[in-house]
Design a protein with these regions (language model features):
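Hydrophobic alpha-helical connector segments
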Residues: 66-102
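Amphipathic alpha-helical segments used for helix-helix packing
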Residues: 61, 90-121
């Protein structure tokens, strides 16, 4: 049965209240009753629309990283484009789904799994399209995700002063250098990235 305008508004109010609670308190401390009170509705309505706290959380943290299309981007511009994209995205998402997910992932395994899935399904796929398939490519994708999540955690959750004080411009410049090395630099590990018996090389060799 299609939702009416009234029910759609109620769902959105519940979702907005849930995001605010998850941002402020994290997953474990947030209750359906609190969300219902904040949304000016009854807990039964929250359950009717979303089914459970887990499903409400999943709806609140549905994330699309909106990754740029790198198909025709010159090799020497890829790192800068990605750095600018992620620095801007984290800034604009300060109280949004991605920040909620990152904050909750520290203490809640389901949130951690959802965050892993976001980066595996989006960042890893992007890096594979850029560099080809192989163990080394997946390692580079993992290192890229590690750096991007670490910067976000330090700047927007922990608010470590040296990182939090950086201007967006300076952070983009620093991140560009790191991302460039992660994607194209040598990796001092004893593992060859092979696909079909042939070693894969990075996009820029």
């Amino acid at each position: 049965v299609p939702f009416t305008n009234r029910s759609l508004a109620a769902r959105e109010a519940i979702l907005s209240a849930a995001r605010a609670r998850f941002t402020e308190q994290g997953y474990d401390r947030t209750t359906i009753r609190q969300v219902a009170t904040d949304a000016n509705t009854d807990p039964s309505m929250v359950m009717r629309y979303y089914g459970s706290k887990d499903k409400l959380f999943a709806a609140a943290v549905a994330v699309d990283l909106r990754l740029p299309d790198l198909t025709d981007v010159p090799d020497d511009e890829v790192a800068g484009l990605l750095a600018n994209h992620f620095v801007t995205m984290w800034r604009d998402d300060d109280d949004g789904p991605l920040t909620i997910l990152l904050r909750s992932a520290v203490t809640h395994e389901d949130a951690a799994e959802r965050l892993r899935a976001v980066f595996a399904n989006q960042v890893t796929v992007m890096v594979r399209q850029l560099l080809g398939h192989g163990a080394e490519t997946d390692l580079r994708a993992g290192l890229l995700s590690t750096h991007l999540l670490g910067v976000a955690l330090s700047r927007h959750i922990l608010r470590l002063p040296p990182v939090a004080r950086l201007s967006d411009k300076d952070l983009v410049a620093i991140t560009t250098q790191i991302v460039d090395h992660i994607l194209t630099g040598p990796l001092p590990v004893k593992r060859a990235a092979k696909t079909g018996g042939r070693e894969r090389r990075t996009r820029r060799s």
